[in-house]
A protein has these predicted regions:
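Active-site metal-binding motif and surrounding structural segment of the metallo-beta-lactamase
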Residues: 80-127, 132, 247-254
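Metallo-beta-lactamase
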Residues: 131-214, 308-319
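N-terminal amphipathic/basic leader segments beginning at the initiator methionine
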Residues: 1-36, 171-181
Length: 320
């Protein structure tokens, strides 16, 4: 596994399958870019269905010549949702070569242990050290503290075969075909993070900048960067700008994932985010998860040619 950023390799194709998101619609239609699983198989509509939850998980497949790699990015909220959807989509967990966790919050780590139990042999787990930070809180205006569940335990992960790769810096994976950003530089003035997030460290309460927030990027030959975020607590614009900086690649072809624009704290920056994304001119824009309904609706209005509605089970394919 390399760590020289200049050696990020171009790829021929990337396939991004949504294993979990906040929304599912079994009646959406296919396009040249996105494939939706059919309602029926062999003439029969199944009695069971794909499920959605407030969480995110994606299976990313990379192709270059005869070489291919499979990455699992995040694992949803519940302990059962992603596994259930993998079974419905006939995905074999043993295909997973590397797991990347975007950050330590519960809605991105829920099915991690059950998945590790189904993977035979050790598997690299790329994660920021602060993902293990605990206790973490939401602090309300009246001073009440809401404790985040501690879902990540190093000893348990290692016992189940996870080969922990704790990284703060950008890291190349999948034979240098994908980049995990590590800590994202915060350079914009309007993306200020989660204002009521706190962390207890050495007995002291302090603001939690969620430094463990990270994304994945690949470079599709002849197209440009495909950037995949988890929650983008660092800010989706900060994330895009940082990927451009560390790769030296300016063309942004696609941005997919959580943009964290939902709720009272973040809705005021929806329009500024739209303005910044417009200048980047992505050809494909797929907001998911914590982007929120209002922001997703605005993206659909402002970017009718590039916006694609996500749904659990959707596979996005970008080819050189």
């Amino acid at each position: 596994m390399g760590n020289e950023l200049e050696s990020l390799q171009t790829i021929d194709r990337v396939e991004i399958l949504t294993l979990m998101d906040n929304y599912v619609d079994v009646l959406l239609t296919n396009t040249d870019i996105v494939y939706r699983p059919p309602l029926a198989k062999d003439g029969q509509i199944p009695a069971d269905t794909l499920v959605a939850e407030h969480g995110l998980s994606m299976l990313i497949k990379l192709y270059r010549g005869t070489e291919s790699h499979t990455i699992l990015f995040d694992t949803g909220y519940s302990s059962i949702g992603v596994i259930h959807n993998m079974e419905m989509l006939e995905i074999d967990p043993s295909e997973i070569e590397t797991i990347v966790i975007s950050h330590g919050h519960m809605d991105h780590t829920g099915t991690l242990y059950p998945i590790l139990e189904k993977i035979s042999g050790p598997v690299p787990l790329v994660i920021h050290p602060d993902a293990f930070a605990s206790p973490r809180y939401f602090v309300l205006e009246d001073g009440r503290k809401l404790l985040f569940p501690q879902t990540l335990d190093k000893a348990r992960l290692e016992k189940l075969g996870a080969r922990l790769m704790e990284r703060r810096e950008p890291t190349l994976i999948a034979d240098d075909m994908a980049l995990v950003t590590g800590e994202v530089e915060r350079t914009t003035t309007f993306e200020k993070g989660l204002p009521n997030a706190y962390l207890e460290r050495n007995g002291n309460m302090e603001k939690d900048p969620i430094l463990d927030d990270q994304a994945i990027a690949v470079h599709v030959r002849g197209k440009g960067l495909v950037i995949i975020s988890g929650c983008a607590h660092a800010g989706i614009i900060n994330t895009i700008l940082y990927v451009r900086k560390v790769t030296g690649i300016s063309d942004v072809h696609a941005v997919l994932g959580g943009f964290h624009l939902s709720g009272a704290f973040f809705e005021p920056i929806i329009e500024e985010t739209i303005n910044k994304i417009r200048k980047l001119e992505p050809k494909i824009l797929v907001p998911m998860h914590c982007t929120g309904w209002k922001a997703i609706h605005r993206f659909s209005e402002e970017f009718p040619d590039s916006f694609i509605l996500n749904s659990v089970g959707s596979t996005f394919t970008i080819v050189s």
